[in-house]
Regions:
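Soluble N-terminal domains of membrane-associated systems
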Residues: 1-102
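Cytosolic regulatory modules rich in charged/polar residues
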Residues: 35, 107-121, 173-174, 199-204
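Alpha-helical transmembrane segments and their cytosolic membrane-interface
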Residues: 79-147, 236-245
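Generic detector of multi-pass transmembrane helix bundles and their immediately adjacent loops
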Residues: 190-264
Length: 264
């Protein structure tokens, strides 16, 4: 701890500030709650004796200052994913910094870089998860085994398509609308071949797109008193839900126009 107290102003303070901002960005863009991002950054600042540190976090940005407003920094966080392994690694790093186990900024920067490089699960694991989730949801919503198999096929296609979109920078509403359309189309075709109702398969597979995390974290932000972040997350959830409805409705409408059959 003595080494921390001897940190000079200037370049070393800037390094500490940049490190704390990078840690906060890593937490926010990988699915951490807003109040936990603020709390973790404040703990790191206090542990490294960065005086007069103040931080304000939104769902897509971080604002922080240190000293008598001599240092300030803003970071935009436009994209958010969910990688709880990275969140856990950064949280563990903050605890080790607070306890003195990690007591230099050099070691802290190295550990943070390692945490940010933790890979996502392999493609086949994500595809298998999508397949299993769609199959189980189809059965939960009243579908038979055939509907579950149709949902599993759609889940595989949807998961593979989402991975493709992630690698090629396709995001926003278009990704959700096109994925929902793909799911609906595959479920209709699969259920036609298997001679079973498509509604349960469609609903079950669409569940893998539902914005459960955004909705839940929005409610949590409201409970914590952060109404702005809560509103942003709730709007995100509503937009995703609307995109799912649009994508599904387009395919169902086209199917009804071409065949004259309205799926219940």
């Amino acid at each position: 701890m003595a080494e921390r107290e001897l940190y000079p102003d200037g370049e070393q303070r800037r390094r500490i500030m940049d490190f704390i901002m990078a840690a906060g960005q890593s937490l926010l863009e990988n699915g951490a709650e807003v109040f936990r991002v603020e709390q973790t950054m404040e703990i790191m600042a206090a542990s490294f004796h960065l005086r007069e540190f103040h931080v304000y976090v939104l769902t897509n940005g971080i604002f922080a200052s240190a000293g008598t407003a001599e240092m300030s920094e803003v970071r935009n966080v436009p994209t958010r994913t969910t990688h709880l392994g990275r969140v856990a690694a950064v949280n563990q790093l903050s605890r080790q910094i607070a306890s003195g186990e990690v007591d230099t900024i050099d070691e802290a920067e190295t550990r943070l870089a390692q945490a940010r490089c933790i890979p996502f699960p392999k493609d086949w694991v994500q595809i298998a998860a999508g397949m299993g989730g769609a199959f189980c949801f189809a059965l939960i919503f009243g579908g038979d085994l055939k509907a579950g198999l149709a949902a599993a096929a759609a889940g595989v296609a949807a998961s593979a398509y989402l991975l493709f979109c992630g690698r090629h920078g396709v995001g926003g509403g278009f990704k959700t609308i096109s994925t929902a359309s793909l799911i609906t189309l595959i479920c209709i075709l699969s259920c036609h071949l298997l001679r079973t109702e498509a509604s349960h398969a469609i609903i079950g597979t669409l569940m893998i797109l539902t914005p459960g995390i955004a909705f839940t974290m929005g409610i949590r932000d409201f409970v914590q008193g952060d109404y702005l972040s809560g509103t942003i997350r709730m709007i995100d959830a509503l937009l995703i839900a609307a995109s799912i409805a649009i994508g599904t409705g387009l395919v169902l409408g086209a199917y009804s126009m071409l065949t004259g059959v309205v799926l219940a």
